[in-house]
């Protein structure tokens, strides 16, 4: 396990339990710690909501799906951008040009289409996390 990675916490928001588990397993295989959330609301409620959740959970990177029940991944990204959000990497089956443009315009550091290979995800996470 990479000692530096073991101190880095990744949050994953995806409503598909199998995908969420697979993404968690992938980042954990590289030594990161991971926590999965089934919705944006669950993530926001995890610790007072908003950027408070990011600070309290000490999140270094947020992996988001776009299509979520209730608040979408793009909307969650916008809500978090009011403060000092962690870097965001989108992993989505809805990888349209419009979604990509919107995500990147609002500061996403990565945008990957499902299905995503583990190495591709890890490359995006590593590129997103500041050194």
Features from the language model and the residues they span:
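Active-site beta3 strand of CheY-like receiver
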Residues: 50-63, 68
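Two-component/phosphorelay signaling modules centered on CheY-like receiver
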Residues: 17-35
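Acidic catalytic/metal-coordinating carboxylates
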Residues: 38-39, 58-60, 72-75
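Short amphipathic alpha-helix used as the core "switch/output" element in two-component signaling
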Residues: 72-84
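C-terminal output helix
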Residues: 98, 116-125
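Alpha4 helix (beta4-alpha4-beta5 surface) of REC/receiver domains from two-component response regulators
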Residues: 75, 95-110
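The feature encodes the CheY-like receiver
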Residues: 20, 57, 69, 96, ...
């Amino acid at each position: 396990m990479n000692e530096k990675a073991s101190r880095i916490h990744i949050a994953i928001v995806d409503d598909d339990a199998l995908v969420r588990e697979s993404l968690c397993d992938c980042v954990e295989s590289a030594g990161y710690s991971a926590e999965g959330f089934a919705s944006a609301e669950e993530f926001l409620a995890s610790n007072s909501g908003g950027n408070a959740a990011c600070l309290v959970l000490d999140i270094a990177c947020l992996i988001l799906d776009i299509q979520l029940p209730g608040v979408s991944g793009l909307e969650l990204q916008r809500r978090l951008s009011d403060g000092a959000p962690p870097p965001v990497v989108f992993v989505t089956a809805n990888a349209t040009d419009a979604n990509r443009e919107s995500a990147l315009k609002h500061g996403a550091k990565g945008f990957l289409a499902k299905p995503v290979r583990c190495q591709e995800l890890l490359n995006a996470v590593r590129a997103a996390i500041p050194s």
